[in-house]
Amino acid sequence: MLERPPMPSTKTTAAIEPRWRAGQRLFRLLAIGLLIVTIAYDTGANHWQQPLQTLTLPWLVSFALVAVLGMAVVPLLRRLKTGQIIREDGPQSHLQKSGTPTMGGIFFVPTGLGLAFLWTGFAQGKLSPTVGAIALLVLWYAAIGWWDDWQVLRRQSNKGLSARLRLLLEGIGAALFCAWLVASDPTATVVTAPWGWVWPLGMAFIPLAIFVPMAEGNALNLTDGLDGLAGGTGAIALLTLGIILSPYPDLQILAVVMSGACLGFLWHNHHPARVFMGDTGSLALGAVLAGIGLASHHLWELLIVSGLFFVESLSVIAQVLYYKATKGPDGVGKRLLRMAPLHHHFELGGWSELRIVRTFYGVVALLGLLCVLLQWLA
């Protein structure tokens, strides 16, 4: 049985206990809900006769492994002084998060990828080159995120890598993955949709395949602004993909293992967070969603289940464009939202972190249910 991680020393127990209990209740609700979904799927698919073929077992192993590993890594990150630098123009309530260890992606991302690679090997009798290629894409994005996190910590400011350099590196990784995908799978340029619709994109697939990991990675990066938000929504989205990808058992395992890894990380990241995933984790999380969607030809389903992430991205784009469009002679424009991304708009409107996170979990769960229903109706 996993022990509850120690309470942060920077707060008194009396002040933090109510928030801790509320955050833990939400975490438990999410964990139980996802567990019920995996058990129901395996029961309906009659997988229990072959435990290695179930979704429940790898999901649980991944969750437990990451949660236990975090008990050693989180204190180490704190000793290494990897404390998060909080943006000065952000919500004032976030200033109390300053000093919380970041770069949490370094322990849940490689653990999930390694377990998925090994599990597919044991379950199918051979290692999956597709899982290996996606793992390389994810590690590339994690490395970009780690470099960005490191620059922020080294400079003690929110200025990490330049946007141009970061996008260039992301584009290189996405292009290499796209090249491998097209070379290894002659049907890679064909995108499927519900009700049997098939879209042969031809050469148009290449720019799309490069864009998707970049868009998904940065969307998750923007979503990672509240305790447990990116980790929880990522766990739901990945499990959704795992459920609908029965024709691709290796990608199914990758999706559910990474979902379990997200939940294991959430054990330490739920409100009030004891560690943040940083760009190391958020960029990697977007990359694994994109890689699975591209390799399985399920870009339509990826778009649906990632709807919240893209709304977060669009809120930032809309805020910038509106500000520029309304700029007056004094050089000051108007804001469309109180603050972008969207979760900060709600936060400044008086919503608590837990209310926002709980609501966003529900939105992604509904989008996931829509994906499953569309797959079933097809």
Swiss-Prot record:
It is an enzyme of class 2 (transferase). Pathway: Cell wall biogenesis; peptidoglycan biosynthesis. It is found in: Cell inner membrane. Its main location: membrane. It comes from the Bacteria. Keywords: Cell cycle, Cell division, Cell inner membrane, Cell membrane, Cell shape, Cell wall biogenesis/degradation, Magnesium, Membrane, Metal-binding, Peptidoglycan synthesis, Transferase, Transmembrane, Transmembrane helix. The keyword Cell membrane applies. Its EC number is 2.7.8.13. The chain crosses the membrane at residues 26-46, 57-77, 103-123, 127-147, 171-191, 195-215, 225-245, 247-267, 275-295, 302-322, 356-376. It catalyses: UDP-N-acetyl-alpha-D-muramoyl-L-alanyl-gamma-D-glutamyl-meso-2,6-diaminopimeloyl-D-alanyl-D-alanine + di-trans,octa-cis-undecaprenyl phosphate = di-trans,octa-cis-undecaprenyl diphospho-N-acetyl-alpha-D-muramoyl-L-alanyl-D-glutamyl-meso-2,6-diaminopimeloyl-D-alanyl-D-alanine + UMP. One of its GO terms (biological process) is cell wall organization. Pfam families: Glycos_transf_4 (PF00953), MraY_sig1 (PF10555). It is a multi-pass membrane protein. One of its GO terms (cellular component) is plasma membrane. GO terms for molecular function: metal ion binding; phospho-N-acetylmuramoyl-pentapeptide-transferase activity; UDP-N-acetylmuramoyl-L-alanyl-D-glutamyl-meso-2,6-diaminopimelyl-D-alanyl-D-alanine:undecaprenyl-phosphate transferase activity. The keyword Metal-binding applies. PROSITE patterns: MRAY_1 (PS01347), MRAY_2 (PS01348). InterPro entries: Glycosyl_transferase_4 (IPR000715), PNAcMuramoyl-5peptid_Trfase (IPR003524), PNAcMuramoyl-5peptid_Trfase_CS (IPR018480). Its cofactor is Mg(2+). Belongs to the glycosyltransferase 4 family. MraY subfamily. NCBIfam families: mraY. Catalyzes the initial step of the lipid cycle reactions in the biosynthesis of the cell wall peptidoglycan: transfers peptidoglycan precursor phospho-MurNAc-pentapeptide from UDP-MurNAc-pentapeptide onto the lipid carrier undecaprenyl phosphate, yielding undecaprenyl-pyrophosphoryl-MurNAc-pentapeptide, known as lipid I. This is Phospho-N-acetylmuramoyl-pentapeptide-transferase. It comes from Thermosynechococcus vestitus (strain NIES-2133 / IAM M-273 / BP-1).
